[in-house]
């Protein structure tokens, strides 16, 4: 099964799980950021959670600009995973605990994502480590789920360290080991920094990057 097929299958299972358990779509706090995923009338001034569902991108996006900027060949799965859908983070249960798959909420969020992946790849170069790029986090908030760029294998990675535990030889095989986790919408803590005024998991990624940068300076 391809990465895009595995992701689409998980998304369908995710929506079905919410319908079976709650007879509704999942909810999410967009924090004033519009998205094609929002499945109701949207008020940018409202602080309430909204019903949402993943939306397939037409046409799909790509990371050609990232590859060109860094003069690197990116594994094809980065496009299949990140550029096929707009979506809020997808909560999951797994053999390694609870976690979230990171996806872009909107085109603006996709651009933030690309900037963060560039930053991650540059930091790996600075640390003289093999290139990886992240696709999620585990619930402890201290570990990323990353993809080894050269092979496409999925690993657990602590910011600033070399990945030590391989979870699956590919994203597709990793996703097949996940099950949807039904959870109430959790309102993210707002921060003052205007560069981080987009919703979802990125504020957690910011804290992880602070830790990574601190370690690299030691």
Curated annotation (Swiss-Prot):
It is found in: Cell inner membrane. Disulfide bonds: none annotated. It is a peripheral membrane protein. The keyword Cell membrane applies. It comes from the Bacteria. It holds the Pfam family Syd. Belongs to the Syd family. This is Protein Syd. It comes from Shewanella denitrificans (strain OS217 / ATCC BAA-1090 / DSM 15013).
């Amino acid at each position: 099964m391809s990465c895009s097929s595995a992701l689409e299958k998980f998304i369908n299972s995710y929506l079905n799980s919410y319908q079976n358990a709650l007879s509704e779509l999942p909810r999410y706090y967009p924090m004033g950021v519009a998205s094609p995923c929002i499945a109701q009338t949207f008020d940018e001034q409202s602080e309430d959670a909204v019903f949402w569902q993943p939306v397939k991108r037409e046409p799909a996006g790509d990371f050609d600009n990232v590859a060109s900027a860094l003069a690197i060949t990116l594994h094809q799965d980065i496009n299949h995973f990140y550029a096929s859908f707009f979506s809020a983070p997808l909560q999951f249960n797994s053999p390694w605990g609870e976690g979230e798959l990171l996806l872009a909420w909107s085109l603006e969020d996709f651009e933030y994502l690309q900037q963060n992946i560039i930053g991650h790849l540059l930091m790996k170069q600075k640390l003289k480590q093999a290139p990886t790029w992240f696709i999620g986090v585990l619930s402890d908030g201290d570990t990323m789920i990353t993809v080894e760029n050269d092979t496409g294998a999925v690993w657990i990675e602590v910011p600033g360290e070399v990945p030590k535990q391989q979870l699956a030889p590919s994203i597709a095989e990793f996703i097949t080991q996940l099950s949807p986790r039904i959870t109430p919408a959790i309102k993210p803590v707002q921060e003052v920094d205007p560069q981080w005024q987009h919703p979802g998991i990125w504020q957690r990624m910011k804290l992880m990057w602070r830790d990574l940068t601190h370690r690299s300076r030691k």
